């Protein structure tokens, strides 16, 4: 059975998801202790905490501690919709596809992704690429990063005359910075603990890199701050903002925290700063969703068709060991009988007779076992087995 365990932006707020990664690891650990997990792939992003598992023998009473749980076809449908951008807060965003690719590769490196989940995740990536190629679901402003920029614009208006500080030069910070660059902004500052990475991104965007120990000075001058680091601790505490931003500027500064865990302490609001989080981007997501309804409907059709193909492929995969064993036995029989025939044909004046004997011998040996099983079924009055044999050999039932 394939199992998906998750919390995401649809069911939980940021604070709940901040603690979810530890709790989901405990759940998976408990399942592993029961010997129920054969394959696993975690998927952790700012908007979701998920595990995909191949499991056997999960007790019906097992407690999943409030997490959403889906099985088999429902779990597969969720993953394909996720890869297509249909489950994202910003519908159609591309970042999730890269995150799914990375999750698969990491699990393969760690040896936790086996052949079944590898097949499933490979299919998910293919479906995500197909949806984006055949629809316009990812056109325009679709990432969390660009949504954060849109939110800042809705408050400040045109940002061309504003100083924007991006904290974090990882994947999410890069998305934010590029969304800013698309608007041809000049005053972009990038701060990162690793200065070289900040410098690299700033050069790419025509902005300025900031040493992390000079972050307070950058805060003092910024009109918009968008923070997206991977830090487990607050980057901007109440005390830091109070020290860095003069009282007369606090009400005009906009801070958008799109990190998980949070980068900006909630009490910063008490200073008069306008602070927004991922939860506040839901409105932007809803507007985006309305614009993309037609594309989403087309994408849903693609996903459903691809799901049917995946389910068919998985069913084929289940019988491959049986088919391989049958073929192996047939091949062994062929080789044995061919060996006998070759020896005979070397000393025979009638090779046609040898070939005739070879083919008859092969048919007799194959038919012998089949006949035994069919006669046994007839003695047991097993009509279903007899019907299946008729169907298998394309015979009329008598």
Swiss-Prot record:
pH and activity: Optimum pH is 7.0.
Residue numbers marked as site, Important for activity: 78
Temperature dependence: Optimum temperature is 65 degrees Celsius.
Protein keywords: NADP, Oxidoreductase, Porphyrin biosynthesis
Stated family: Belongs to the glutamyl-tRNA reductase family.
Other noteworthy facts: During catalysis, the active site Cys acts as a nucleophile attacking the alpha-carbonyl group of tRNA-bound glutamate with the formation of a thioester intermediate between enzyme and glutamate, and the concomitant release of tRNA(Glu). The thioester intermediate is finally reduced by direct hydride transfer from NADPH, to form the product GSA.
Domains (record comment): Possesses an unusual extended V-shaped dimeric structure with each monomer consisting of three distinct domains arranged along a curved 'spinal' alpha-helix. The N-terminal catalytic domain specifically recognizes the glutamate moiety of the substrate. The second domain is the NADPH-binding domain, and the third C-terminal domain is responsible for dimerization.
Protein name: Glutamyl-tRNA reductase
Biological classification of the source: Archaea, Methanobacteriati, Methanobacteriota, Methanomada group, Methanobacteria
């Amino acid at each position: 059975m394939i199992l998906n365990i998750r919390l995401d932006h649809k069911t939980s707020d940021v604070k709940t998801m901040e603690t979810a990664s530890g709790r989901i690891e405990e759940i998976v650990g408990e399942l592993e202790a029961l010997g129920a997990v054969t394959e696993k792939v975690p998927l952790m992003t700012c908007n979701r905490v998920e595990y995909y598992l191949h499991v056997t023998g999960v007790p019906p009473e097992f407690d999943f501690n409030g997490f959403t749980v889906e099985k088999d076809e429902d779990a597969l449908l969720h993953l394909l919709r996720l890869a297509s951008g249909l489950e994202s807060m910003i519908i159609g965003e591309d970042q999730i596809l890269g995150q799914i690719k990375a999750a698969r590769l990491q699990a393969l490196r760690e040896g936790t992704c086996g052949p079944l989940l590898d097949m499933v995740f490979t299919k998910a990536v293919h479906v995500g690429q197909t949806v984006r190629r055949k629809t316009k679901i990812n056109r325009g402003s679709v990432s969390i990063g660009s949504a954060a920029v849109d939110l800042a614009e809705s408050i400040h208006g045109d940002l061309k005359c504003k100083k924007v500080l991006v904290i974090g030069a990882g994947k999410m910070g890069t998305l934010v910075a590029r969304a800013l660059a698309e608007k041809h902004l000049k005053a972009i500052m990038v701060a990162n603990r690793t200065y070289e990475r900040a410098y690299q991104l700033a050069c790419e965007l025509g902005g300025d890199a900031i040493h992390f120990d000079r972050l307070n000075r950058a805060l003092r001058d910024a009109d918009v701050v968008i923070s997206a680091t991977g830090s487990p601790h607050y980057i901007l505490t109440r005390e830091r903002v109070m020290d860095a931003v003069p009282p007369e500027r606090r009400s005009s500064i906009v801070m958008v925290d799109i990190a998980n865990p949070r980068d900006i302490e909630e009490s910063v609001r008490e200073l008069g700063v306008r602070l927004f989080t991922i939860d506040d981007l839901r409105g932007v997501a809803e507007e985006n969703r309305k614009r993309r309804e037609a594309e989403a409907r087309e994408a849903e059709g693609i996903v459903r068709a691809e799901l049917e193909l995946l389910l068919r492929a998985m069913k084929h995969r289940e019988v491959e060991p049986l088919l391989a064993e049958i073929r192996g036995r047939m091949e062994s029989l062929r080789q044995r009988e061919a060996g006998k025939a070759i020896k005979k044909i070397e000393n025979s004046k009638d090779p046609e007779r040898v070939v005739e004997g070879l083919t008859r011998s092969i048919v007799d040996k194959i038919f012998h076992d089949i006949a035994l099983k069919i006669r046994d079924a007839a003695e047991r009055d097993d009509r279903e087995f007899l019907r299946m044999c008729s169907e298998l050999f394309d015979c009329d039932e008598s």
